[in-house]
Amino acid sequence: MDNIEPPFSGNIHAETEVKKEEKKKMKKESVSLMGLFSAADNVDYFLMFLGGLGTCIHGGTLPLFFVFFGGMLDSLGKLSTDPNAISSRVSQNALYLVYLGLVNLVSAWIGVACWMQTGERQTARLRINYLKSILAKDITFFDTEARDSNFIFHISSDAILVQDAIGDKTGHVLRYLCQFIAGFVIGFLSVWQLTLLTLGVVPLIAIAGGGYAIVMSTISEKSEAAYADAGKVAEEVMSQVRTVYAFVGEEKAVKSYSNSLKKALKLSKRSGLAKGLGVGLTYSLLFCAWALLFWYASLLVRHGKTNGAKAFTTILNVIYSGFALGQAVPSLSAISKGRVAAANIFKMIGNNNLESSERLENGTTLQNVVGKIEFCGVSFAYPSRPNMVFENLSFTIHSGKTFAFVGPSGSGKSTIISMVQRFYEPRSGEILLDGNDIKNLKLKWLREQMGLVSQEPALFATTIASNILLGKEKANMDQIIEAAKAANADSFIKSLPNGYNTQVGEGGTQLSGGQKQRIAIARAVLRNPKILLLDEATSALDAESEKIVQQALDNVMEKRTTIVIAHRLSTIRNVDKIVVLRDGQVRETGSHSELISRGGDYATLVNCQDTEPQENLRSVMYESCRSQAGSYSSRRVFSSRRTSSFREDQEKTEKDSKGEDLISSSSMIWELIKLNAPEWLYALLGSIGAVLAGSQPALFSMGLAYVLTTFYSPFPSLIKREVDKVAIIFVGAGIVTAPIYILQHYFYTLMGERLTSRVRLSLFSAILSNEIGWFDLDENNTGSLTSILAADATLVRSAIADRLSTIVQNLSLTITALALAFFYSWRVAAVVTACFPLLIAASLTEQLFLKGFGGDYTRAYSRATSLAREAISNIRTVAAFSAEKQISEQFTCELSKPTKSALLRGHISGFGYGLSQCLAFCSYALGLWYISVLIKRNETNFEDSIKSFMVLLVTAYSVAETLALTPDIVKGTQALGSVFRVLHRETEIPPDQPNSRLVTHIKGDIEFRNVSFAYPTRPEIAIFKNLNLRVSAGKSLAVVGPSGSGKSTVIGLIMRFYDPSNGNLCIDGHDIKSVNLRSLRKKLALVQQEPALFSTSIHENIKYGNENASEAEIIEAAKAANAHEFISRMEEGYMTHVGDKGVQLSGGQKQRVAIARAVLKDPSVLLLDEATSALDTSAEKQVQEALDKLMKGRTTILVAHRLSTIRKADTIVVLHKGKVVEKGSHRELVSKSDGFYKKLTSLQEAV
C-alpha cells in the first residue's frame, strides 16, 4: 500500500523501533542470494517474475503520485489567474491520480499474491526434503553429529525465516528499492538543487533513528533476559508445586521471584529515558531539517528556479524515497536471516549421505527366514563413546527359541538389539541371519522381519489405529483389532469414547503408561515378525495386566526367534536360554534352573532381587537407572490425577464461574487503575508530555501549509520574511521536542514496568495460595500459568500503559487538528473527514504490509512441526518399523492445507492491499478537486483550504494508528480476565486459615475416619468410600494394592494436597482442617518416586529441607542418604549445580539428594512413595538401611509397589477399589493362601 503518511505524524518511533533479534542459534554460514531460491521449480520462477514486476511497478507509483500531487497544488495556487483553464487542469490531474490508483491496485495485488504463493511452495518443498534427509540418516549420525543440532528449530523456526525471506520480504525490498530509485530520479529531474540538499539531511535523521533502535535493542535484550530469569523461577516452582508445598517453600519462592523482577525494573528507567531521548532527538532533527529545506526552497522560488508546489513535493519525494531505503533495511535483515537459516536446511539436504538412504533399498533378501541369529567375534564401541562395549563377542540364537539377556548396567544388553536391527555396524566380526551377514541384506527388508517393543513406548500424535498401523502399513481394521486383543488392549480401547479413532496426543500423553505400552505391543504383534525384540515390554503394566500381557507375549513368541532384555527377572523364567553379560562378554548361558544351580552371576542377581527367596516375595529391577534409557517408572506420583485419559471437559467449579461472571470489563479496568494507583504522578507527567507531543504534528502541518501558500505570494520580500519566521519557529520547536518526548516516554515506561512487576508478583503469590486440586485442572497447567505470569502480565502493561501513551498523544492530535481544520475551512474539512475510512484503511493495510500478510506461520504449521518433532525424537522407532515413507507422506499431507490456503490468502491480501491504496489515491484526488471547486466559487481561498487539507491528513493517520492498537487493547483486556481470575479466587484449602491451630510438635497418630474422596477433576470416580485407616505414633504403615486403588491418594490427603469430600482425617486426634496447614507440613516429610530438585546447587537443594540447618547437619543428612560419597567426588562438591530439574545428576543421585532433604527436615511423620525405586541394588540396600534408621520413632507411611521395601513395616494394608481389604504384618498376610496380598506377592514372584 502506498500510504502517504505526513512527514510528521507522531509515529516515527513506531517505524524506527525494531524487534529484539533472536538469540543466535544458527551458524554464520549463509547461502547466496540466488541459492535462497534453489528449491524453486518452473512455476515458482514464473510467480517470482510476475511478482517482481508487480512490486517494482507498485514501488514507482508513490514518486509518480507526488508529481501529480505537485501539479494539482501548483494549479490551485495559480487558480485565481485563470479559473476555468486551471480548474480543468486540476480535474485532469485528479483523473491521473485515479488512474495511478488503479495501477497501484493491480500491481500490489499481483506482487503480494505471487510472492506469498511462491514462498509457501518453496518452503514446503524445503521442509519435506529436510525431514526426508533426517529420516534417511543412520542412528550413528544421531549419536554423534546430531547431538548438538536442533532439527525441530531448523524445520520450524528456520523454515519460517526462509519463507519470510522468499515471500514477503523479497517483495518488500524490490518495492522500496524501486521507490528509492524512482523518487531520486524524479527529484533530480524536478529540482536537482533541492534534491541534493535533502539527500544531505535525510541520513542525519536515519542515523539518529538507527542509533536509537540499537540502544533500545540492547536494553530490551537485557530486560528480556531479566524477565526470562524470573520466568524460570516461576516455571520451576509451579512444575514442582507439590515439593514446594510439602517443604513450605512458598515464601522463599515469592522472595526469589521478587528479586528477579527487581532487576528488570531497574532496566526500565534506562529504557524509558532512551526511548524518550531517541524519539525526541529524531523529531528535533526533522524539525531542523525542514527549517533548512524551507529556507533554501524559498531562495529557489524567489529566484524563479522552481515553483512552490514543485519545491514542496520534491522535498516530500526525496524524503519518502530516503525513508523507503530505511524501510527496506528490516526486510534486507530478514533476507539475511533467511539465508543463514537456509544454510542450515540445505546443509542437511545437500549432505544427505547416499549410503544412508540407498542402503534402505540396496542389498539382497532371503526367500525364507528361519530366524537363526549369530554373533561371530563381534567387537563394538559406540561412535560417541570410545570405551568398547563388546570385544570378540560370540553366541548363537537358534531359530524359534527365546533368548533373554541379563546383566548389570552397561553390559551391552540393549546394544545387542540395536545391532540386530543394524542401527550400528560392528568394528569387527559378523552378525549373521540364517548364515547371511546382515550387512549384505536389504536394510528395509531386514527390519520388516523384526518387531520391536521398547521399554519406553513411542507413540505419535494421531489415532490409536494409526499408531498400531505403523507396524504394518496395509493392514485392515480386523487385523488391527486382533493385534490389540493379543496385547490386552482391545478392551480399554473400546471403552474410550472414540475407540480406535481416539487421538493419543503428542507422545501419547492422553494414555497411561500401561496403555501406551500395550499399543506398542499391538504394533509389534501386527507386524507378525519372524524375530521379536522385547526390551522390558511389560515394565509399565501393573501386576494384573502384566500377567495377562505376558501370557499374550508368550503366545506371540511361539515359533518365533525372540530376544528379551530383562531387568525384572520374573519375565524370563520360562525362556529357552538366558545369557548373562558382564564387561562385554558372555559370562553364563543356560536355563533359569541351570543358572540358579551354578550359583554364578545370575544367581547373584536373583539373590540381590530377593533377600527372602524362601518366601518368594518379589521380582524387582536390579538396575533401575539405566544410562541409555532412563529409570523405570510405572507412574508419576499424583500427576496422573489431573484428568482421566479421555474424560470430557469438566465444568469449572461454581465458585470460579460465578467469580468470573462478576468481573466485567469495566470493573477490571477500574481495578487495574486502583492497582496502578501508586503511579498516578507518573501517569500525570507522562500524559502532559503526550498531550504536548500530540499537538506538535498538527501545528507542524499548519507550518507546512503556511509556507506552501506563502510560496505563491507575488512579493519576494514577503516570501523571505514569512519563510524565515517559520524556519526559526521550527528550530525552536526542535529544541523543546526532546524534553517533551522524554517526559512522555520516561514516565509512561516507568509506570508500565512498575505495574507489570506488581501484577506479576501478586499473581505469583496468588497462584501459590491455591490448593493442588486447582493445579490439576487442564487450564491451570504449568505452561498456562507461566503464560499468564509472563505474556498476560506483559499484555496488560502493553495494552494499558504503553498504548495509553499513544492514545493520549493521538487524541490530543485529533482534537487539535479537527479544530484547526474546521476553523479554516469547514467545507474542505467535512469532505476530507468523510474520506477518513478510506485513508485509515490505507494506513492500516500499509502496516500489515510491513509486517507481512503471511500470518502466524508457527500456528499454521504446528501440526506438521509436531509430527516432525515426534518422528525425530523417536527416530529409533521410525527406523525399526521402516516408517520413513509413512512419516514423510503424513508430513506432506499436514503441509498441504497451509500451502493450499496460501493461494486464497495471497489473493485476498493482495487485492485488499491494492484496493485500499487505490481508494486512498482517489480520496486525495477528490479532496484537491473539491478545493478547486470551492476556490472557483469563491467559497474559500487557497491558503485556508490547503491548511485544512494538510492538517486533516495528519489526523487520518493518527486515527489509523490508534485503531491499529485495538487488537492489543482487546488482548490486554482479555489478559486482565486471566489475571483477575487468579487474583480473585479463594483457595479451597487455605494455607494460613484464621483461628487455625499452630502446631509446634506432633506425636504422629494418624487416623482416617469414614473418609470418602474423589479427585476434583473426576468427581464421578470415587477413590475412597468410607475408608477407615489408622497408624499409631512411631509405627510404620505400608499401603499396597493394584494400580488405581488409592495408594498415593493416602499420602496426598495426609499432606492435605486434597480434602476428603466426607469423613475426617485426624492427626493426634485433631481434624487436620483445624490445624494451620503450613505448621503441619513442617512436621511432615515427603519423598516421592520421582525426585523434584531445583536448578541450584546440591547444597541448596538439601538445605531446602531446613533453611536453618548448619553445614555439619547438611553433610550428616547426605551421609544418612548415602549421598555424601558421590557428592564429594564431584569437582565442586556440594556447590555442584544440579541443572534444570536435576538433569546433571543420575536418577539415583537425584533420589538420594531428595532423601537427604527429607532427613534434614527431621520430621515427625515420614511419607515414602517408593523412595528407593531409582537406586541400583547396592545403593538401595544402603539407603534402605538409612531410611530404616530414620523411620525409628517416627510415624511412617510407605506406598509400595516393590514389596521388598515393606516387609519390615509394622502394619501392611491392602487397598482394592478404595477400601481396605486386608490388614496385618507381612508374615500374617502371606500366610493367607487366597488373600489379596498373597496374590500380589505371587505375581511378583521371581523364583
Swiss-Prot record:
Glycans are attached at residues 362, 392, 780, 938, 1010, 1108. It is found in: Membrane. Signal peptide: none annotated. The chain crosses the membrane at residues 49-69, 95-115, 172-192, 196-216, 277-297, 315-335, 680-700, 727-747, 807-824, 830-850, 915-935, 949-969. ATP 1 binds at residues 407-414. GO terms for cellular component: membrane. It is a multi-pass membrane protein. The lineage of its organism: Eukaryota, Viridiplantae, Streptophyta, Embryophyta, Tracheophyta. ATP 2 binds at residues 1041-1048. PANTHER family: ATP-BINDING CASSETTE TRANSPORTER, ATP-DEPENDENT PERMEASE MDL1, MITOCHONDRIAL. Coiled coil: none annotated. Residues 373-608, 1006-1242 form the ABC transporter domain. One of its GO terms (molecular function) is ATP binding. Residues 48-337, 679-971 form the ABC transmembrane type-1 domain. Its main location: membrane. This is ABC transporter B family member 14. Keywords: ATP-binding, Glycoprotein, Membrane, Nucleotide-binding, Repeat, Transmembrane, Transmembrane helix, Transport. InterPro entries: AAA+_ATPase (IPR003593), ABC1_TM_dom (IPR011527), ABC1_TM_sf (IPR036640), ABC_transporter-like_ATP-bd (IPR003439), ABC_transporter-like_CS (IPR017871), P-loop_NTPase (IPR027417), Type_1_exporter (IPR039421). Belongs to the ABC transporter superfamily. ABCB family. Multidrug resistance exporter (TC 3.A.1.201) subfamily.
